Amino acid sequence: MNPRLFSPHIIRSLLDLDAYKINMMQAIHHFYPDVSVRYELIVRSEEDASGLLDAIRQEIAHLGTLRFSDADIHYLTQHAPHLKATFLQSLRYFHFVPQEQVEMGIVKQGGKQQLRISIRGSWRDTILYETLVMAIVSEVRSRQRWAEVPADLPLKVLKTKLDQLKAEIERRGINNFSLTEMGTRRRFSSQVQRDVLACLKQEIPQWVLGTSNYHFAREFDLKPIGTIAHEWFMGHQALVNERDSQQVALERWLTAFDGMLAIAPTDTLTIDAFLNDFNRHLANAYDGVRHDSGCPFRWGDKMIAHYQQLGIDPTTKLFIFSDGLDFDQALELCEYFAGRVKISFGIGTFLTNDLANWRNAAGVEYRPLSIVIKLAECQGRPVAKISDQPEKAMCEDPIFLANLKRRFNIELDVDALIQELRHQKRSPRHYISAA
């Protein structure tokens, strides 16, 4: 194991996660302390990750040994003023119980094998797993299958990008670029993310707002940044009337944080369904919105028109773009929306897991593993993410999905629904290994 790329334990602090997970944990602690949930890992890549199972199991078991330290609580008290004292005190008693909460194995579906990770338990006690487990899966894969990557390559790639970024910003006279590093979940390794943040802070401090990772925010004295994720909205589909779920989620988030952290993702259902619920009260109360799927230019135009229709000056609002961005796309968006709205970027894999088409000795080109962990059930009921990008949609129950679309006047492809029902009947998931 190359110590310049990897460390013996992947996760060594419970703060080594995305800040929005702890934010949502507080809201759940307040509103839904007894709600049960199930999460599922989804491997979007064609690559079979089942061979990583044993090493992943060991790393997830290690999570059970970690606790929030006094220093962790003190840091959050000082740098996360939106977190209430009573909630922070409750973190002192928090710990994972992986042997009860996490089921791992290999699923056989359609004649192929794939890694399966299922997380179950109370929402409050399991919500922090997502970022940690994704980082574990990504790094185990890196050290088992791509250990021969030159240790200096990730930083070389990044520095080339930063040189090009600085030159383009100067050449084009762009003055509205800023970014938050959001690369924890799909990073090549923890050490690479550390090196990336050190490089960003040294090379472009004027454009780096902070990082979504509490652990590295503390280490590099950066601002920890995070608001809310699709999960909050998905859970409400099972907790209130489906048609009211989006508005209730938006309202309760404002209540949970007294109006702070008011940046809303718009694509849990689709941008059009979101705008139908994003009334003048909510549009005023929220500082801005986040784009995570679909065409960002059309999305931004639609959001600006919505604010104008409500009589709200869009230049007072913030648009955050976080959908698989690179610097070229970000600068195009800077130019397109200049003077029309405040913008910023959440950039992840492009920073923490890009090896610039590097190939191993066998000639295989490196590609990051595309994975997500998403809420599948809440209180034993299915939930869904529809998205503005079909490949990002997810729901285990096609009947529930069809009903949800009907309730929100989202177009339903009946032929696709019939095909999915036939496919589920023909090819149910078959678990051939579990622990």
From Swiss-Prot:
Reaction equations catalysed: nicotinate + 5-phospho-alpha-D-ribose 1-diphosphate + ATP + H2O = nicotinate beta-D-ribonucleotide + ADP + phosphate + diphosphate
InterPro entries: N/Namide_PRibTrfase, NAPRTase_N, Nic_PRibTrfase, Nic_PRibTrfase-Fam, Nicotinate_pribotase-like_C
CDD domains the UniProt entry points to: PncB_like
EC code(s) of this entry: 6.3.4.21
Enzyme class: ligase
List of residues that carry Phosphohistidine: 230
Keywords in alphabetical order: Ligase, Phosphoprotein, Pyridine nucleotide biosynthesis
Recorded metabolic or biological pathway in which this protein acts: Cofactor biosynthesis; NAD(+) biosynthesis; nicotinate D-ribonucleotide from nicotinate: step 1/1
Gene Ontology biological-process annotations: NAD biosynthetic process via the salvage pathway
GO molecular function term, any single one: nicotinate phosphoribosyltransferase activity
Short name of any one Pfam family annotated for the protein: NAPRTase_N
GO cellular component, one term: cytosol
Gene3D superfamilies per record: nicotinate phosphoribosyltransferase
Post-translational modification: Transiently phosphorylated on a His residue during the reaction cycle. Phosphorylation strongly increases the affinity for substrates and increases the rate of nicotinate D-ribonucleotide production. Dephosphorylation regenerates the low-affinity form of the enzyme, leading to product release.
The keyword Ligase appears for this protein: yes
Chain's role: Catalyzes the synthesis of beta-nicotinate D-ribonucleotide from nicotinate and 5-phospho-D-ribose 1-phosphate at the expense of ATP.
Entry-linked HAMAP family: NAPRTase
Family from the record: Belongs to the NAPRTase family.
The protein's name in its UniProt record: Nicotinate phosphoribosyltransferase
